[in-house]
Amino acid sequence: MDRKIRVAAIGDNCIDYYDSLNESYPGGNPVNIAVYIKRLGGESSYTGAVGTDSFGKIMISAIQNKGVDTSHIQVLDGKTAVTHVDIVDGDRVFGKYEEGVLADFKLREQDISFIKKHDLAVTGIWGMIEDELPLISKEIPVAFDFANKFANPIVEKAIPYVTYAFFSFDEESLNEFRQKYHSMGLKEKENCTEQLKEFMKAMQQKGPKVIIATLGKNGSIGYDGNSWYRFGIIECKVVDTMGAGDSFIAGFLYGILNGLNVQDSMEAGAQNSAVTIGYQGAW
């Protein structure tokens, strides 16, 4: 893996504020992925929006200090997004979310031209760039983190333009998953795993080259239209699960872009997650 791959991370960012600790950490799905790509040895950029408050300056400075290209961050009048977080038994629990200036974020022509110069673009369900995906996907592959928002309308809107699709399957999203599953008219299956696989097959046929479902402590499942893949987790001490999913995505994409197959890329994702959950905060 000696080729310097270049990944454009686009969309939301937020300050993760731990109320009980009175500590704040810069983060957000695409921001985290950009930082992890750098940690793995690649090149990355982040395109998004921050406010004119102190958190905006902290966000830009923190990303720059990790070596990520911040030349296309928009500074908009207002407040930077904040997510309130707490730690309960090693797991993060989300509280109030304040969107701030992200509500006004939109890609400009110069941003799209910049993004197209990368090897891959990665964004997510809160990235607000689904309207630009047809343009971007004509030039470079797109990775999209749909998180556990199975029934969100953005899923159907974005999926045809996505090369690598990621979903997160957990107890919290079980009802939403079943709602989406039945709305698609898919066959009843004997258990959740079989239903998830049926869903993944249906989604993969809508456009993605590969679809991955992360299962928390149960590892991940992958499907490429021909074969199924499964990988567990790398055992490690859990300090904070913040960034675990984003670490997996970054590790997987870094592996794929450097020529690894799906199975080995899933292992690379798990290894990267194990590093991240061993310390406080996403990075």
Regions found by a protein language model. Name each.
Residues K4, I15-S20, S24, G42-L120:
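Conserved N-terminal subdomain of the carbohydrate kinase-like
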Residues D12-N13, W126, S247:
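Active-site metal-binding loops of divalent metal-dependent hydrolases
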Residues M1-R6, K180-W283:
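Conserved phosphate-binding/catalytic region of the ribokinase-like
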Residues I115-K116, I159, Q205:
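A short, aliphatic-rich alpha-helical micro-motif
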Residues P30-R39:
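Histidine-anchored nucleotide/phosphate-binding helix
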Residues R6, D119-L120, Y164, V210:
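Structural motif
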Residues R6-D12, A143:
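Short, hydrophobic/glycine-enriched beta-strand segments
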Residues L120-E198, K217-S220:
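Conserved beta-alpha-beta core of the PfkB/ribokinase-like small-molecule kinase fold
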